[in-house]
Amino acid sequence: MMAARIKKGDQVVVITGSSKGSRGEVLSVRPDDNKAVVRGVAVAKRHTRPNRMGEQGGIIEKEMPIHLSNLKLVDPKSGKPTRVGFRILEDGRKVRVAKATGEVVEG
């Protein structure tokens, strides 16, 4: 399995699709199908039935998964979208690096 370029908690921007230009925080990543759920992006309305536990039915808004190829990480230094690379530090740790500025991405 490849190293994760986008992780939970990262700030990302959508680069293509109906939500192009939207920014948000990654809520979850699904490595099996290469998708991520981003807060406030790709929101769909879902109709739910009431259940026996007392939960109300109705229309709820839910964030839908977006393919990772449609997302770019926001550079922590410049605030602009950037590609992600990897670097091995002197202490042997492998860290993510913003390609545009060379800044280490925490997370």
From Swiss-Prot:
InterPro entries: KOW, Rib_uL2_dom2, Ribosomal_uL24, Ribosomal_uL24_CS, Ribosomal_uL24_KOW, Translation_prot_SH3-like_sf. The keyword RNA-binding applies. Keywords: Ribonucleoprotein, Ribosomal protein, RNA-binding, rRNA-binding. One of its GO terms (biological process) is translation. PROSITE patterns: RIBOSOMAL_L24 (PS01108). GO terms for molecular function: rRNA binding; structural constituent of ribosome. GO terms for cellular component: ribonucleoprotein complex; ribosome. It comes from the Bacteria. Coiled coil: none annotated. Part of the 50S ribosomal subunit. PANTHER family: MITOCHONDRIAL RIBOSOMAL PROTEIN L24. Belongs to the universal ribosomal protein uL24 family. HAMAP family: Ribosomal_uL24_B. One of two assembly initiator proteins, it binds directly to the 5'-end of the 23S rRNA, where it nucleates assembly of the 50S subunit. This is Large ribosomal subunit protein uL24. The gene is rplX.
